[in-house]
Amino acid sequence: MQGSVTEFLKPRLVDIEQVSSTHAKVTLEPLERGFGHTLGNALRRILLSSMPGCAVTEVEIDGVLHEYSTKEGVQEDILEILLNLKGLAVRVQGKDEVILTLNKSGIGPVTAADIIHDGDVEIVKPQHVICHLTDETASISMRIKVQRGRGYVPASARIHSEEDERPIGRLLVDACYSPVERIAYNVEAARVEQRTDLDKLVIEMETNGTIDPEEAIRRAATILAEQLEAFVDLRDVRQPEVKEEKPEFDPILLRPVDDLELTVRSANCLKAEAIHYIGDLVQRTEVELLKTPNLGKKSLTEIKDVLASRGLSLGMRLENWPPASIADE
């Protein structure tokens, strides 16, 4: 076995034993010692609690106002019917919510095959029994809401949020969205050349038929990898660059008007009006400057030309002027 002593072995998919369409065993090896339990436990938790799927969330049965009742001509009570609907395996394409209907009369079992649905919905186990009608005159009609979700959401978690708008007779069902019904893993010994301290991970799982077991493991591994991406990217995190704060005002506005090299007459007129900085000057208008004693149109034109050469003009508005550095002087 070649490679550095610090280099980790990469597992490969050794075998997929398809016990049935809903039951499979997946074997991965070789894994470094301890990694069998590390990966097996992580995948098991994701498969049980975080896999998306579809489940029955609400039911309306004609003639039934609450779940603690019975219906004439039906063998099961309403609670048992809701429990049977909870086990309904449904696959929905392209929608997050669908409404299914069921109408059945006459003696005999009522199964998932009796549910009316469109082409976007597939009932995976049509033989699944919902209830039994015990009389030739008995009948049952219901509307079944199926929604897409993740994990397990009890009806009690939705009661308070929907109480005000939920009409009487609409029965909430504990929603088990996960398509995985059973998952277990086992860690066995593995060997590569002279190394005998390695792990072999065997994952055994059963689904409700809405997803292939192999695909379920693939999705769980994808979820785990996506959650770990943030830790992988830690190596690329760089210290944020300290950006220099931009000055509040253009530095030229903080310079004295003497830097404009105006004629003595114009400079003296500005000083007489307490205009000491270029920032003070650009805030004045032509009308205001013409009111300055001894400052005529010739001086005004000179000032405008000098400011224009520096990309400035009269009548500018400067918020928060003067800055603290000038105000304190």
Curated annotation (Swiss-Prot):
GO cellular component entries: cytoplasm; DNA-directed RNA polymerase complex
InterPro entries: DNA-dir_RNA_pol_insert, DNA-dir_RNA_pol_RpoA/D/Rpb3, DNA-dir_RpoA, RBP11-like, RNAP_asu_C, RNApol_insert_sf
Chain spans, region Alpha N-terminal domain (alpha-NTD): 1-235
Name of the protein in its database record: DNA-directed RNA polymerase subunit alpha
UniProt xrefs under HAMAP family: RNApol_bact_RpoA
Keyword Nucleotidyltransferase applies: yes
Record key words, sorted: DNA-directed RNA polymerase, Nucleotidyltransferase, Transcription, Transferase
Domain comment in the entry: The N-terminal domain is essential for RNAP assembly and basal transcription, whereas the C-terminal domain is involved in interaction with transcriptional regulators and with upstream promoter elements.
EC number(s) stated in the UniProt entry for this protein: 2.7.7.6
Family: Belongs to the RNA polymerase alpha chain family.
GO terms under biological process: DNA-templated transcription
Keyword Cell inner membrane: no
Chain positions covered by the region annotation Alpha C-terminal domain (alpha-CTD): 249-329
Pfam family, one: RNA_pol_L
Reactions mediated catalytically: RNA(n) + a ribonucleoside 5'-triphosphate = RNA(n+1) + diphosphate
Biological role: DNA-dependent RNA polymerase catalyzes the transcription of DNA into RNA using the four ribonucleoside triphosphates as substrates.
Subunit description: Homodimer. The RNAP catalytic core consists of 2 alpha, 1 beta, 1 beta' and 1 omega subunit. When a sigma factor is associated with the core the holoenzyme is formed, which can initiate transcription.
MF terms in GO: DNA binding; DNA-directed RNA polymerase activity; protein dimerization activity
EC top class, as a word: transferase
Organism from which the protein derives: Photorhabdus laumondii subsp. laumondii (strain DSM 15139 / CIP 105565 / TT01) (Photorhabdus luminescens subsp. laumondii)
Intrachain S-S bonds: none
